[in-house]
Amino acid sequence: MSSDAVKKRKPKVIRSEAGTPETKRGRAESEQDVRVYNEEVELEGRDPQQDYTLYKETCAALAKLMSEIQELKTSGAKDGSAEIELRRKQSSIHFITLKKLNRLAHMRLKKGRDQTHEAKQRVDVLHLQLQNLLYEVMHLQKEIGKCLEFKSQHEEIELVSEDEFFQDAPAEISRPQVTREDHHQLTLARLDWELDQRKRLAEQYKTSLSSKEKIQKAIEQKREYLSSLQPGLHNIMQASLPVQEYLSMPFEHMQKQAEVARHLPPPLYVLFVQAGAYGQACDKNLTVSIRGDVDEAKALSRPPEDSQDDESDSDAEEEQQNTKRRRPTVGVQLDDKRKEMLRRHPLSLGIDLKCKDGSVLHLYFYYLMNLNILTVKTKVSTSVDLSGAISAGELLNSESLLNCLYASDHGNETPNPANRYQFDKVGITTFADYVSDLGHPYVWVQKLSGLQFSSDAAQSELSGSALSASHMEKSMKLLRGRLQSRLALHKQFSSLEHSIVPVSSECQHLFPAKVVSGLTRWTMMSHQEFTELSFVQHVLKAGLVSETDLFFKAVVERGTARLLAAVVVNPRYPEVTPLFSLSLLWKGERSGRTDDNLRAMESEVNVFRAELQGPRPGLQLLTNQIQRLCMCLDVYLETESQVSDGSEGPKEFPREKMCLRTARGPSRLKPFKYNHPQGFFSHR
């Protein structure tokens, strides 16, 4: 652009109306105030869509004018020519229009924001009002709940029903014409009737007490009369001894045994009577005998506690008399006190339980006089030699044979709470240290002898002979069942150690005719070895294992696959199902925690007890579990997808089992359920 053109444009840019600057500024401000006001009024009547259309048209016209000016300048027209000036004026008008549209847009935006802010304030006010109402409702509900929960003292009194009240109560108390309409008066009338009844029953109670005293006096008189018959009966029995010898009748033996039984302590006597009665009535293979020194038992004429106190007094007198005698050390005194506290009664009781196969369970019951508890020792006699199975060494161990005969009854601690304070005096930390010498103080042994302590007194109201009789039959059945189950396990372990899983003919239908996977190893392990296995940690955390359980390790193999099974056999087997935990060594190491199909195999073995129990009482449960484990391993390997390495040839595990579906669900579970007699596998 030339300097002449600049000089020509200057007067146009600074050109303005005449007047001083102050006058022009004041006039401009007044005109702008009017324009702003007019534009606000005008904004109410304008359509935003039309303004948007006008904006696009103005922009298009402005672009067209700019292009025309560009063409004119390109064609050689001068900057101040009439055509360029005309288009420049038109462009200025369009710029003014755009500015106006911009102002209107900003005004609309401000107006919209103001309206939004006002609406938001109204919403906030309504929300606060709603919250206040909700708080008031919650407060009223709490107050209503307090009112509804209020209980008057008369509500704790058990009243007769309204029908019985109107039927039995006299009219002066019931007043049906008033109480049937007024609930409050009805409640008062029922309370009056209850008071009247209780007064009448109190009088009847006094009358019953007086009659009870009369009956007790009559009973005492009859007892005295029956006691006077004892000498005569004894003479008759002595006179009949030659007849008993001639007829070979056991009355004399029974009489002698009864004479010895008189010197038994009360708990052993209760057990002797109840066990003998049960043997005569229900179990002919049960025999009871009394063992020990009768003369020493006769010498115990005073209670153990009194004799112990007298002995301590006599020892003190001897020490005072023999002052020159050397006093024993503290350790020796404690040992003597421990021996005295743990002293057994001279007489003990023996019970022999015979089984059909000729095996005998010998039970020896001892009474600890100062502790007031019974202990038991066991011994098993079998008709055949059972020394073949190495893993069955703990099955017939006398120390663990009767563990958990009842649930959680380990027999390592005394059930008498008072013994804890007695142990503290003589420095005994735990009774378990003396169990091997004295026997196990099982809770069921105490109940068989009629002993009941405060720890379990709340569970039973029986005591003495009634308590013993209530537990005798069940305990004897459990003892015989424990012996049978351990003998069956001993026989099964002998086969398992030779890699043979014995399956009886009654259980053959539970498995297919051909099971390729086989047991290759069966060994016993300790609790410490079990806890060190990585794939059983979830079982330990769940508390499903205790130190009294029996632990075994089974290895099942097929080809290159090797399945490890940690087996936990509860002492109450087969009542409690053995627990299997699995780990598969094949193409890496897998366990039930990482492989859903191994977890399903564990479920097949651990959960479905009813299918594997076999004939009652379920002594074949463990071997059936192992056989099912071998069957499930076959299904697992045969249905597992083979990863091709590019080589041709037969698969390692050809499919021999018929399956409806090889996998199901997102976890791709395999069909482990065997369906007999169809012979195919399906999902559960």
Swiss-Prot record:
Compartments (UniProt record): Nucleus; Nucleus speckle; Cytoplasm
Signal peptide start-end: none
Gene Ontology CC terms, in alphabetical order: cytoplasm; nuclear speck; THO complex part of transcription export complex
Xref: InterPro entries: THO_Thoc5
Sequence motif Nuclear localization signal, location on chain: 7-10
Feature: compositional bias, Basic and acidic residues: 22-32, 296-305
GO molecular function: mRNA binding
UniProt keyword annotations, A-Z: Cytoplasm, Differentiation, mRNA processing, mRNA splicing, mRNA transport, Nucleus, RNA-binding, Transport
Domain of life the protein comes from: Eukaryota
Alphabetical GO biological process terms: cell differentiation; mRNA export from nucleus; mRNA processing; RNA splicing
Keyword Nucleus in annotation: yes
Function: Component of the THO subcomplex of the TREX complex which is thought to couple mRNA transcription, processing and nuclear export, and which specifically associates with spliced mRNA and not with unspliced pre-mRNA. Plays a key structural role in the oligomerization of the THO-ddx39b complex.
Quaternary state and interactors: Component of the THO subcomplex, which is composed of thoc1, thoc2, thoc3, thoc5, thoc6 and thoc7. Component of the transcription/export (TREX) complex at least composed of alyref/thoc4, ddx39b, sarnp/cip29, chtop and the THO subcomplex.
Name of the featured protein: THO complex subunit 5 homolog
Species name: Danio rerio
